[in-house]
Amino acid sequence: MTSFPPGSRIGILGGGQLGRMLSLAAAPLGYACHIFGPEADPPAGQVADRVTIADYYDESALSAFASDVDLVTLEFENVPAVCVEFLANVIPVRPSPQSLATAQDRLIEKEFASSIGTGTAPYRAIDSISDLQTAMAQIGPLSVLKTRRMGYDGRGQIILNGSDYLDQAWQDLGEVPSILESFITFDGEISVIAARSLDGSIIAYPPIANQHRNNILNTSRVPASLTTEQTQRAIAIATQIAEALDYVGILAVELFVKGDDFLFNEFAPRVHNSGHWSIEGAVTSQFEQHIRAICGLPLGSTDLLGRAEMTNLIGSDVNQVLTLLAEPGVHLHLYGKTEARDNRKMGHITRIFPKTIRP
């Protein structure tokens, strides 16, 4: 694989807050970023070197974009596959279209995890109401129906408890290809963020404990309260996934904690909300690490600078900014979004505590 030295231009598919923070991390390393996406006035466009506003299916715009950059990465996994494949035919795309395709489809993702020996909740493929009825009889009444595609922040899923509302649930999800998973009563949720470089070297951050509100990540704390053996196993799972995918870049693996064991939930082929604390809380942020990995630079240290806690500012939470800034030691990141809608991530704050003090 080709490495790209400082002075190269990185194309980023998607112009949201992740593209924004990637652009901010790339600049000190000597890289310029060109954002491509359909959204007018994207948050990343406020800090990136260049912006193209065009549809992901616009081949003319994609060709012009590809001719202006040296390599392409992405800020979210729901970029149309045809867009990524079109670009990959003419320019390096990292992570690969194959990694993206695995993450885009929940069934393929679960089958992949199972194929490498990673434990998952029991699941079944659903293509009809008949499939749903059969699957519930096999898995049990307490379950989660999820669309195979376009699911994030709690979207595209319905919790079921019995067969009374199967028809309605199937209709509510649009009667699209789905999976039914057994509902897992877990003790906690963690994520492991790992980076894999062009030469196959891998480094991971300590596991992160996550708490959600309304199915959206609310707070992340690192390091998670795990035993040394659990920490090693969680990192080993993320490492195994990255190696099996021949992955390049930052990868986030979400796991359910159940007793001493872990069950795979999903992976994100990109920088991740649960890693935002790393901007102030680690020697190398996840955003800088991603740039290093995709460009072939040496990976940076993932050592913690203290115990860290990241809290998302969602919707009207952003109105607390002045109060939060009055708190000593709070690090504020606003994403440049103008409208504070319900369930919209407007920014985040990070608090860093001495390693001897538990937040």
Regions found by a protein language model. Name each.
Residues 27, 87-88, 114, 137, ...:
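Anion (oxyanion) recognition and catalysis
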Residues 3, 334-359:
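Generic C-terminus detector
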Residues 1-108, 130:
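ATP-binding N-terminal substructure of ATP-dependent carboxylate-amine bond-forming enzymes
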Residues 303-313:
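Short glycine-/aliphatic-rich beta-strand segments at the starts of folded cytosolic domains
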Residues 172-226, 231-264, 268-276, 291-301, ...:
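Phosphate-binding core of ATP-grasp and ATP-grasp-like enzymes
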Residues 160-162, 196, 313-316, 349-354:
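Short beta-strand-to-loop capping motifs
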Residues 102-191, 195-241, 357:
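Active-site nucleotide/adenylate-binding loops and adjacent lid/helix of ATP-dependent enzymes
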